[in-house]
């Protein structure tokens, strides 16, 4: 687990929680929740890779882990599109920087999860 990614998650979550986007704050809360969920999933998948013996227990414990992996990639794609949309509509520079960093982090995490999943397959 890359410490820079962990601190990036924490930084972006903190920044997003401070943002005030008026009527769309519910949507922002949804994005924050998705980010937190994605972080937990990424961390657990990374830990499973580090303990390669966990592959069998992961498969036994959850026979649908590949399906869940596909769902996570769908969530990442949704988050990427949502963050891109927010980036296009915001004029606040603080929000623009936050969303640009969030987009970069999502792309990095997507790549990490792909790498982890290939190691587990």
Curated annotation (Swiss-Prot):
Coiled coil: none annotated. InterPro entries: Flu_NS2. One of its GO terms (cellular component) is host cell nucleus. Its main location: virion. It is found in: Virion; Host nucleus. Keywords: Host nucleus, Host-virus interaction, Transport, Virion. A motif (Nuclear export signal) lies at residues 12-21, 85-94. GO terms for biological process: exit of virus from host cell nucleus through nuclear pore. Interacts with protein M1. May interact with host nucleoporin RAB/HRB and exportin XPO1/CRM1. Average number present in a viral particle is estimated to be 130-200 molecules. Mediates the nuclear export of encapsidated genomic RNAs (ribonucleoproteins, RNPs). Acts as an adapter between viral RNPs complexes and the nuclear export machinery of the cell. Possesses no intrinsic RNA-binding activity, but includes a C-terminal M1-binding domain. This domain is believed to allow recognition of RNPs bound to the protein M1. Belongs to the influenza viruses NEP family. This is Nuclear export protein. It comes from Influenza A virus (strain A/Wilson-Smith/1933 H1N1) (Influenza A virus (strain A/WS/1933 H1N1)). The lineage of its organism: Viruses, Riboviria, Orthornavirae, Negarnaviricota, Polyploviricotina. The gene is NS.
